[in-house]
């Protein structure tokens, strides 16, 4: 039995510009108008229709809750002149669009985390020392910094791999950078929470001394359900307190959505094939 005041949310995996697959999945689900729609980040990039995808999700208004992913932030960084387009990027059409400024502003005002009814959604993951309250505090710090007038300077300072582990003594840019990397980049960490940023295979491909972030011993968010995307090689994974949503649509696999519920046994999975959304090899 669920406790959601409205319809339980439907959470979507990484769209990455796969607009046709998203439309097929949405039409298959046919959600009621009061159903909240959650998106685990990476709405854009590498798929063939980033502009159409972003416009459609933005047009959902408050019904859509989309956390920021690394590709969404790459879009902001390119728009700000901090980074340049890379081979395989498909965000140029957004930057060239007549409504580019409005779309960039919409992305810039998305959250890094969303918490509701014991469910915490982020794009990539969390560090083991963080409980839900600290994760939300750090997400709020990042969100406020990215929404401020000097957001370009802030975003520039967030890129980098160091420090790669949490300490309550971290301050200013170092504190924000660790949070930024955990929310949007992490896959593997040491049992103590030191992040590794190169490996992107499945759990069996963990570098020596590392493990999936969600298997870190004593992880303090084990008392809530974490909903996340980012990790295509992990694929769709449902545990009692985990919902991993990225099933690699942009790589020609599947796009997944999960109708969430307080009772894990009541979750409902819907998937569509993504043959028409194949990105070039990294």
Swiss-Prot record:
MF terms (GO), sorted A to Z: bis(5'-nucleosyl)-tetraphosphatase (symmetrical) activity
Name of this protein: Bis(5'-nucleosyl)-tetraphosphatase, symmetrical
SUPFAM superfamilies reported for this sequence: Metallo-dependent phosphatases (SSF56300)
Role according to the record: Hydrolyzes diadenosine 5',5'''-P1,P4-tetraphosphate to yield ADP.
InterPro entries in the record: ApaH, Calcineurin-like_PHP_ApaH, Metallo-depent_PP-like
Highest taxon above the source species: Bacteria
Entry similarity comment: Belongs to the Ap4A hydrolase family.
HAMAP family from the UniProt entry: ApaH (MF_00199)
Enzymatic reactions: P(1),P(4)-bis(5'-adenosyl) tetraphosphate + H2O = 2 ADP + 2 H(+)
Record keywords: Hydrolase
Hydrolase keyword on record: yes
Keyword Zinc-finger: no
EC number: 3.6.1.41
Species for this entry: Burkholderia mallei (strain ATCC 23344)
């Amino acid at each position: 039995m669920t406790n959601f005041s409205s319809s339980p949310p439907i959470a979507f995996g990484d769209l990455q510009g796969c607009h046709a697959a998203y439309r097929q999945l949405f039409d298959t689900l046919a959600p009621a108008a009061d159903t909240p729609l959650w998106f685990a980040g990476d709405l854009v990039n590498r798929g063939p229709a980033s502009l159409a995808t972003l416009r459609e999700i933005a047009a959902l208004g408050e019904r859509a809750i989309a956390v920021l992913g690394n590709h969404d932030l790459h879009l902001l960084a390119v728009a700000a002149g901090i980074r340049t387009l890379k081979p395989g990027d498909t965000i140029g059409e957004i930057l060239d669009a007549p409504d580019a400024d409005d779309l960039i502003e919409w992305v810039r005002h998305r959250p890094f985390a969303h918490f509701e009814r014991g469910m915490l959604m982020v794009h990539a993951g969390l560090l083991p020392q963080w409980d839900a309250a600290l994760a939300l505090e750090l997400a709020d710090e990042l969100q406020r910094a990215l929404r401020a007038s000097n957001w370009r300077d802030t975003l520039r300072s967030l890129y980098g791999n160091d420090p790669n582990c949490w300490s309550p003594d971290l301050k200013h840019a170092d504190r924000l950078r660790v949070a930024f990397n955990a929310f949007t980049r992490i896959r593997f960490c040491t049992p103590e929470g030191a992040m590794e940023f190169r490996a992107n295979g499945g759990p069996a491909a963990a570098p020596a001394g590392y493990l999936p972030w969600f298997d870190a011993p004593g992880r303090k968010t084990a008392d809530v359900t974490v909903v996340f995307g980012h990790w295509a090689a992990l694929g769709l994974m449902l545990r009692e307190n985990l919902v991993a949503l990225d099933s690699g649509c942009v790589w020609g696999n599947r796009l997944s959505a999960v109708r969430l519920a307080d009772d894990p046994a009541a979750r409902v999975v819907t998937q569509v094939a993504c043959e028409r959304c194949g990105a070039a090899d990294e």
